[in-house]
Amino acid sequence: MDARYNPQAIESKWQAHWREIGLDRTPELKDGSRKFYALSMFPYPSGNLHMGHVRNYTITDVIARHKRMQGYAVLHPMGWDAFGLPAENAAIDRGIPPAKWTYQNIAQMREQLQRLGLSYDWEREITTCAPDYYKWTQWLFLQFFKAGLAYQKEAPVNWDPVDQTVLANEQVDAEGRSWRSGALVEKRMLKQWFFKITAYADQLLADLEKLSGWPERVRTMQENWIGQSVGAKVIFKTEAGDELAVFTTRPDTLWGATFMVMSPEHPLVDKLTTAEQLQAVRAYQAQAAARSEIERSAEDREKTGVWTGSYAINPVNQERIPIWIADYVLMGYGTGAIMAVPAHDQRDFEFARKFGLPIKRVVQPPEGSLSSTDRASGTESSELQAAWTGEGVMINSGPLDGIPVGKGPGQSVERAIAWLEAQGLGEKQINYRLRDWLISRQRYWGCPIPVIHCPHCGIVPVPEKDLPVLLPEDVELTGRGGSPLAQLEDWVKVKCPTCGAEARRETDTMDTFICSSWYFLRFSDARNDREIFRKDRVNAWLPVDQYVGGIEHAILHLLYSRFFTKVLRDRGLLDFDEPFLRLLTQGMVQGRTYYNPNKSGKDRWIPAALVKDPDNPTDPETGEPLEVIYATMSKSKGNGVDPEEVLAHYGADTARMFILFKAPPEKDLEWDDADVEGQFRFLNRVWRQVYEFVVRGGGTESWRGRVSELLPAKVEVGSLTKAEKDLRRAIHTAIKEVSEDLENDYQFNTAIAELMKLSNALGEAGIPDSPVYAEGIRTLVLLMAPFAPHIAEELWQALGGADSVHRQSWPSYDPAALVADTVTIVIQVNGKLRGSFEAPAEVTPEEQEQLALRSEAAQKYLEGATPKKVVVVPKKLVNFVL
């Protein structure tokens, strides 16, 4: 064993050895096996790891390594979410085929992951852009199609009029311009493919109750995204006789509806618009088409709209009310039309005030809730300062007058629904904010949709025997002209599998979220080329026991994965309801960030590399002093830390220890070079402790076989000295605390703090030749193994340990060792600390007082005086009051 810790030398050595012996290979599950499936959200192969990756994967790796040492059969795989726009853009910008660019990046990132010492089963590696994977993605599409869950319809898309192509929402900036051409983006209607996720809305919502191992924040985000609303569907009739359906959560306020508002995209707009209003309506529709749904539905945005020229009849009171269109009403939610009750809805109130529409109050607030002006305005509440949305009683509402406002039994909403159903004017309905999933992408680098369009047979699914539908390689990518696949006539033209006529392939590719919505299932049987996975294997390994990833995936990826799992359950492919039992959303990694408050935009951020004096930072261009904050690492801020540099200088174990020690996993982590250095010093200290122990014992060979015998059960507790008992207590306290930190809330930071305490206790014990010291050294190395796997392996071998440290059993603590023989008693005089002394653990209060009186501290500070009062806190404190 070398006297000096050299992480680069030992880490590469052990990584090669682990690969050679298949240390991380997933074992076959046997009857009675305890399984544990640990999974990090797999990355997009951008080419370089960032510190966010390092944190995510290190967290999961510690969990996986700990579970293996506990005797679990562990599945801990890795793969690549490899389709997507960046590869296509790289092909356009650099003239590199997307596949070549992607696989180069995968090779580079795989090497980086291996250098971190991550215990992945690389034999199960999957790549979503590989035909042997996307064959099964296409097969899943066919299962959705057969189940009626995949369909095609016209839908609005972002259209770049310069590049003549469809843009994803992320490619449209805040001003509504294309990221590439700068052109104002238009909304166009194109035929698009959808997955009917709304068919599972009720299950997705109800089963959130099963996810007790998920953060409450994530469950709430999903609940809000699904957005269940209980209310009523009510039919209004226009004066022309057309039916206009609305969904409302407040049917009790129908008597206060003074106008209606339709979405600009509502199919009845054309029919209801009069000739006099046609030009104004057309202009307004064009304006609305240029705005995103987020912009349109912003609460603080000024309301806009235009009258159609038509009227509807309020079914509950036969009043004639005007029909408007406004972009704050979205076609995708409810029916695309609303009844407007301005006295009791703030958006409707602002709209009515702007356009001079009537405001009628139908809820009487509790006494004292309204201003005198509002009370005086009475029924025609044109002078209200804001909509009243609180409690009260119904007024001006016919059969509901006097009923208390609320959604509970016997309250206004329930009574209104019952009355509407009895009158045949409406019915109870449950609506969801969730919309069907638009999966079409007019892109090349994605999974082809396995559908053929036949002029005679219509939409024909590709036969399963013909899967996969391969992406053509001879494609020219320009970023212009719509779908690149549509330009390849030789690929597009195909015979209809049903009738044999000339037909055309679908040229859209699938949303990449589809590839990531089932990858965790494939890992259970990753090399199966006959079926997507064997049912017995997926049921044995799934659900995932611990899933780790960023909060940014709280909604879409996690919701889609839950949806896929439920569909595949209903198709008989698996037998569980939810894919992930426990979820950990790690915090961001933040870097020291410099900015000039006198500059704006991107120019205000000054890259850390340009700051010469971090203690007194100045702008290298202007000399102005810079402000310093911690912000999420990003290229734009120039505040990132390259993992490669950290590995080269300190090694993987130091990087892992810092990442785990600096902050609890769910909190943001502030990168600090001084703390990295601190972890490096700690590992050096442990190295020296083991080195000195081995040298003192005559070298590794003299210890071979002996270290494994120095187990707690072998220690003769009765013959131990006080120093040995104290050290043994520290050893078993460390085992207990580290085990609990790894088992419960993954408080890795406090677990590492316990390792430091144990190292300190070993250094201070002064009994290097004791068997208890040997037990402590052995325990320290075992406890370190999940956190710093390379140094733990090297030290374990130096101690003469058999096999790999990662194949050892996790140590268990001896409860008897935690019980102290003595207790420390604090001495106070008039409430001030004056000293302490050791007393037997079984000391009585009377004995404690007498021992305190005879102590050196009491003799010094009492100066012979007799205390007026003595306060004894058993086994803790004696306070002498003079």
Swiss-Prot record:
What reactions does this protein catalyze? tRNA(Leu) + L-leucine + ATP = L-leucyl-tRNA(Leu) + AMP + diphosphate
Classification via PROSITE patterns: AA_TRNA_LIGASE_I
**Enzyme Commission number:** 6.1.1.4
Q: Which domain of life is it from?
A: Bacteria
> Which InterPro entries does the entry mention?
aa-tRNA-synth_I_CS (IPR001412), aa-tRNA-synth_Ia (IPR002300), Leu-tRNA-ligase (IPR002302), Leu_tRNA-synth_edit (IPR025709), M/V/L/I-tRNA-synth_anticd-bd (IPR013155), Methionyl/Leucyl_tRNA_Synth (IPR015413), Rossmann-like_a/b/a_fold (IPR014729), tRNAsynth_Ia_anticodon-bd (IPR009080)
Q: Where is this motif: 'KMSKS' region?
A: 632-636
GO CC annotations on file: cytosol
Q: Which GO terms describe its molecular function?
A: aminoacyl-tRNA deacylase activity; ATP binding; leucine-tRNA ligase activity
Q: Looking at the keywords, is Protein biosynthesis present?
A: yes
Compartments in which it is found: Cytoplasm
Offer one example of a GO biological process linked to this entry: leucyl-tRNA aminoacylation
User: For ATP, which residues are the binding ones?
Assistant: K635
Name the UniProt key words of this record, in alphabetical order.
Aminoacyl-tRNA synthetase, ATP-binding, Cytoplasm, Ligase, Nucleotide-binding, Protein biosynthesis
Per the record, the major location class is cytoplasm
Q: Look at the named UniProt entry and state the broad enzyme category this protein falls under.
A: ligase
Instruction: Motif 'HIGH' region: list the residue ranges.
Output: 43-53
Q: What family name appears in the similarity comment?
A: Belongs to the class-I aminoacyl-tRNA synthetase family.
Q: List the protein's name.
A: Leucine--tRNA ligase
* Lineage of the organism: Bacteria, Bacillati, Cyanobacteriota, Cyanophyceae, Synechococcales
Encoding gene (name)? leuS
